[in-house]
Structures are given as structure tokens and as C-alpha cells.
């Protein structure tokens, strides 16, 4: 199934927390299919809400029930591009993300990769919306614990547990 159809199937009607990543990876293991980021995000929810999940699918349904959604700055993979091409593609994606933020109107937005902060901040500005914005470290490359702990803090404050 196409990544955007999969992503849309997990979109809640009201988005409380919007996580923004860079792009789905070229490997096809993106958040809503099977990725390490899914597992680390589930770990933050377990710590914040005392929840347990049978598997990734169970977690993703809980994530949706909590009003959480993951979108990407760019909907096409950029991790296999040269740095100049990647930058070009990310800059070209700002207006699209701004439009989606305007339409979703999240209360909280968490940028899930520090290096895309300037693009996402510009998209937030162009959207005309004013969510509380947080920047998380990437959920890999040795930063998993920081990602989980910082996301847990956001969840404890802004995202109530669901049953």
C-alpha cells in the first residue's frame, strides 16, 4: 500500500499532537509500517501513560485515539539524496507542510529531528497557526533515550491517556 494511504488511515479527526519527521525513509520502513521510531515513540507512551501494547499495530491505534499523528516535511524519501538535493527538496516542501498544519491545527507540534527545525518553524509561521512547538532529537544514532524522555515530558503535559 502507498505510504500516504497508510498514513491517512491513522489520521485522527482532531489532532492534538503533530509529530513532524523529515520524510519517509527510502527503505520503506516508515513510522506507520515498521520502524525503530515507532518502537521508541511507543516506549515514550508506555512511560507517560503506563500503557502496554501487544504490537506496533496496537500502539498505532492508541496513538491515533490520543489525537496524535505523524506527518513528514517531505512526503518523498530524501535520505538517499546528496545534501544539496536534500536541502532543495526540504525547502520545496515548506508550503505543503504549512498548508497541512493550517488544516490540521494541532495544539502541539514536535519536530522529530533537530536538523529540520528551520524548515518546520517556517512552515508553522506560514500556516498562521500557533501550536506549542518542541524540538526532539532524532530517535536513533544514540539519541533514543533523549528522544523517549523528551517526548514523555510532552505527553505527560499535553496528551492525556486513553483507555
Regions found by a protein language model. Give the residues of each.
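Short, charged, surface-exposed secondary-structure boundary motifs
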Residues: 140-150
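A polyampholytic, Gly/Pro-enriched intrinsically disordered region
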Residues: 150-163
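A polyanion-binding, active-site-adjacent surface
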Residues: 1-139
